[in-house]
Regions:
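AMP-forming adenylation/ATP pyrophosphatase catalytic core
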Residues: 13, 63-67, 107, 111, ...
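Catalytic-core segments of class I nucleotidyltransferases/pyrophosphorylases
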Residues: 122
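Core alpha/beta nucleotide-donor-binding catalytic domains of modification enzymes
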Residues: 1-112
Length: 233
C-alpha cells in the first residue's frame, strides 16, 4: 500500500482498468464526470507541482490518451448543481468520505479555494484566465506538430524515430513536448514520462557529443548530431 500520492496512484489505476475494459470491448470513447470545481482544483494542484502551461490546463472537455478519447461533458457545471440534481431528480447520491480528509492535497486545495472565494475570488474571471491559457497552449501545440513533422523520421516498422539537429534548435517548451511525445509514441505508453526525467535527458543531449539513456520503454541515443529513439526489447 503506497504511503504517498495515494489519490494520484488510485486515479492512475482507475484509468488503467478503464483502458483495459475499453481494449477488451473495442471502446474508443470514455465519458468522465469531472465538473467545474475539479477544473479549478486541478489548476492549483498543478501550480504546487511546478507544472508548465500544458499541465495547468490539462483538464479539458476533450483529451486523448493513446487511442482513447476522454470526454468531460459536465466540465462547465458546478458541483453544487450536480449534487442537487442527483438528490432531487435521481434520488441517489453517494458521499465519498475521503472528500473531507484534509491529509489529501486535493481536499486542502478545496479549502483554499473556498477561502479565496470568501476573500473575493471571482470564478468567472478565473475561468477566463484558464481559457486564455488554453489558447496559448494551442499555439505551442502547433509548433510541436511542426517540429515533429519536419525534424523527425520514423523507420518502416515504426520501432525507431530519428531526430535531426534542428529538432533541438526550437524553443525549450517545443523541444520538451516534442521529445515527450516521441518517447510516448515509440514506447507505446498511455502516459508521458515524468517531466524531470525528460528535462535531464534534454540537458545531456544538448551538452554531449554521444549519450545513451533509457526512459518510457525506449532507448535514447545520441550519435554525433543525430538522436535515435528505439523501443527497448
Amino acid at each position: 500500500k503506497p504511503s504517498k500520492n495515494v489519490q494520484s496512484i488510485a486515479r492512475k489505476k482507475r484509468y488503467e482498468l478503464l483502458f483495459r475494459k475499453c481494449d477488451k470491448y473495442k471502446i474508443k470513447y470514455i465519458l468522465l464526470g469531472h465538473h467545474q470545481d475539479d477544473l479549478f482544483e486541478n489548476f492549483f494542484i498543478r501550480i504546487l507541482r511546478g507544472s508548465g502551461l500544458k499541465g495547468l490546463i490539462s483538464l479539458d472537455k476533450k483529451n486523448k490518451i493513446g487511442d482513447k478519447n476522454l470526454l468531460r461533458p459536465l466540465l462547465d457545471e458546478k458541483k453544487e448543481n450536480l449534487i442537487f440534481i442527483s438528490k432531487n431528480v435521481f434520488n441517489f447520491y453517494i458521499e465519498d468520505p475521503t472528500n473531507k480528509d484534509e491529509k489529501y492535497k486535493r481536499i486542502m486545495i478545496r479549502g483554499l479555494i473556498k477561502k479565496l472565494q470568501e476573500d473575493g475570488l471571482d470564478k468567472k474571471k478565473f475561468l477566463k484566465t484558464i481559457n486564455n491559457l488554453k489558447f496559448s497552449n494551442k499555439v505551442v501545440d502547433y509548433y510541436v506538430d511542426e517540429n515533429l513533422k519536419k525534424n523527425t523520421f520514423i523507420s518502416n516498422n515504426n520501432s525507431r524515430l530519428i531526430l535531426n539537429n534542428i529538432f533541438f534548435l526550437q524553443p525549450y517548451e517545443v523541444i520538451f513536448r516534442s521529445l515527450s511525445e516521441s518517447i510516448k509514441m515509440i514506447g507505446k505508453k498511455y502516459y508521458a514520462a515524468r517531466g524531470k526525467k525528460i528535462d535531464k535527458i534534454i540537458n545531456h543531449l544538448k551538452k554531449s557529443v554521444s549519450y545513451r539513456s533509457t526512459l518510457g520503454g525506449c532507448i535514447i541515443e545520441k550519435v554525433n548530431e543525430t538522436v535515435i529513439i528505439s523501443r527497448e526489447q
